[in-house]
Regions:
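Structured, hydrophobic secondary-structure cores that serve as assembly/anchoring elements
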Residues: 1-103
Length: 103
């Protein structure tokens, strides 16, 4: 089972790392740099027995996402039978709540 503290610490670390990419263009290099920036932290979790997968590529950053000035980053964390998904979306400045709500 994944403890709430592990999830909260991971979310906090993601926030810190992602903040360095706020004004970067969503391209292959930026997505790779983001993934690589997370590796040291995620490696520690792997050493503790967690399975980790990062997704930040063209599969979740389509042309539409890029055209909307967004960047999607997802971390899957698994231990035993417990699997969690942490979604991070960087959006353009000035976005309204109405734009974020599903139609």
């Amino acid at each position: 089972m994944i403890s709430q503290k592990v999830i909260e610490d991971l979310e906090t670390h993601i926030e810190q790392v992602v903040s360095h990419f706020w004004f970067e263009v969503n391209n292959q290099q930026t997505r790779e740099d983001l993934r690589v920036s997370m590796v040291p932290y995620l490696s520690n979790l792997i050493e503790e027995g967690y399975e980790i997968e990062q997704v930040c590529d063209e599969s979740n950053n389509s042309h539409e996402v890029i055209d909307n000035n967004e960047l999607y980053y997802v971390v899957y964390i698994k231990k035993d039978d417990d699997l969690r998904q942490i979604n991070t979306v960087m959006r353009k400045t000035g976005v309204s709540f109405q734009e974020l709500r599903p139609a």
